[in-house]
């Protein structure tokens, strides 16, 4: 891997070349081959899942068929992780286009969940149609064609202006600002933030050509591991709640232990990245903190709407947004840190 140097261990490469609107730009953009190193990471994940499944099965066996909500929920969570990991592996194996399609579908599901919880009126229906059938496909088209200029400003600028314009044409001014702002939030979180995950495939990093899929593996593995480890440490040692009004299940010990453990995991994964061990740990710490804060923000929104979960799409986990809320906040930061310091 090509390691960057400079202040705080980061390189001086910044900016990057704009996209040329070609799906096959620079030869790497069409379908990057699945990297063997990513395969080893997934093998380790499947190994952990196999161990977790064995432990859960043993716990259930000890109950001799008696119902236990905690054990049943644990089994449901583990089974869901098997499915999610397999789907992610398949998308990564298919390469760049498969990964973009997967996250397009994730954004679609997340947007649907978000908009289903906001108050809407008849005048908002056209706005929502634009969100699903204009903003969503165009944003991922810009990822597919590697058009960074439009990818970075389309939703924050043009989408931000377009949505209230369409809403105002409906002639309904009742709670206009609140209705429009909620839809803008839904688009930013569900489409713009999530689209930064597959956009990592478009970065051009010296000495790392054709291996960008490993950046996605690093991001998803570290952020999701942080979530799981915060839960585990919280169950083992957690007593003091960190933000009981927002997330009653989060504890100080769980948060600190989970983020610290995931940061160590990030350092251990440095061989699959263009980072040094220190850089990988520092970036891991940043994205874990962003993931934690993102989880708090999304929990605050759920509390405001009076619901426990965003949906029930993923058995044992809730909705799509319940599973990717931390990634939504970590992905843009990770993307721009890598692009600023490593992109050629």
Tell where the protein language model's regions lie, with residue ranges.
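Short, strongly hydrophobic alpha-helical membrane anchors
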Residues: 3-36, 344
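Membrane-embedded alpha-helical bundles of polytopic integral membrane proteins
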Residues: 22-286
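Hydrophobic alpha-helical transmembrane segments of membrane transport and translocation systems
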Residues: 328, 332-337
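Juxtamembrane boundary at the C-terminal end of a transmembrane helix
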Residues: 337-344
